[in-house]
Amino acid sequence: MFFFEVELFDAHVLISKIIKSANQSIFLFDNYIDETVLTQLSKKNKGVTVKIYIKNISRQLQLDVEKFNTQYGSLQVIEFGKSHDRFLIIDQTAIYHLGASLKDLGKKWFAFSKLLIDPALILGKLDS
């Protein structure tokens, strides 16, 4: 899908639907996380675990995550510097490539694609 800068709400709705579709897990690779992304992730179903992989975990982000977990639970941030692009993996079965950070969706033109690869290809590299 392709979104123009005026399609902020449409981009937000699409991401919300994808987040709500998760029944078990969400993996997010995005180096530009802030509280707006946590707000989007608060729409997850109860019991869904979230792991965010980010290059640097700021003190502010850590505080925001602690508050998120107090109310919604099951969110973990992990320092990870190997990814330049942004990816969203749902239930270890679907993987999306994001042309923009979740916090910036709809601010400028960007593309959003579902990849036809097995998410295990990426998830299997996390422990190595």
Regions found by a protein language model. Give the residues of each.
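PLD/PLD-like phosphodiesterase catalytic module centered on the HKD motif
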Residues: M1-H12, S21, F27-S128
